[in-house]
Amino acid sequence: MLALIKEEGYGKAWLAADAPFVIDNNYLGGTWTFGVNWSGSSKAYGLTQAIEFDKDEASQRLQDWLDTLPINRPALLPISNDIVLTPQPGQNALFFSVTNDSSIVTKSTQTTEFDLAYSFPAWSGDTGNLYLGAEARLYFMRLSRLSVRFGDVTDSEELFDAIRHSEFRNDEGVGVDVGALWVSDNYQLGAQITNINEPGFVFPDVNLEPYKSEGAINFLLADQRYTMDRQLKLEGSIFTSDRRWSAHVGYDADSATDPMGDQFQWLTVSGGFTTDSWWLPSGRIGYRQNLAGTKLSYVGIGVTAFKFVNLDIASALDTVRIDGTTLPQGVMFSLGFQIAW
């Protein structure tokens, strides 16, 4: 991740585990689903400000320093309001530092989620069936945040220690989703609105005392609060008459923001097949693109093995060079198990 930050100016990691349980009964006339999910994410990026630099002024200050007797030369040489040089004649070296409010910002979250969903058949006819449902999600979040000005970094190891030992703040919230699904013989259409109530969570404070820029201060204050944006999700699927082949499309009608502050709005297209094989009962291929934020596109492939193991992997089409090696900008990997009892 640090190598990615070096090349791209930011780095991000995400990990999740999910355990859904479907209770197949007709209590209150529908189906109940209970799930537990854990996810963690972290990101480091630069908060940059333009450096004020006048070449003629810097040249004059440097010349004045050279014209001063060595014994009277100051240890620090500011060549602009934002740049300070530290000459080390004994080591034949010159150190450079930026003194404006450009910073490195790190954020991380750990989320435990409990969800309870209920769906029921609202209408049935010759052309298909309409299902309605709702879901409540209880979130327990641990949030951490650190911001350090580049000019205040004197020891990179101390900085990484501070990042690793950042304090977490605990926060809780409840989200509500509603949805509708129309199912026919050869197709289905669905719509879901997530986080209708838009629950909010608060990151810890960061030390604003060293900051002078109003823009940097306002950004860090606004960045303290994370809101789960309301989002409309649409989906559609078509099937062959024997349901061995299928195609699926999913579309987020608007963008939303994740805890790291990145926007996402996914468009997904996939196709799948099923067989009578016990070893490999189904397979799938897919394409997904983030229409907001990073604008990254992914291609993926997945299989179901032994009728209960789901394995999927996806890779971004865009690449980045790290230490001379070309790598995809993003990789997704998923391993799941489905068991009925």
Briefly describe each language-model feature range.
Residues S103-W123, L130-A136, F140, E172-V183, ...:
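Extended, compositionally biased low-complexity polar/Lys-Gly-rich tracts
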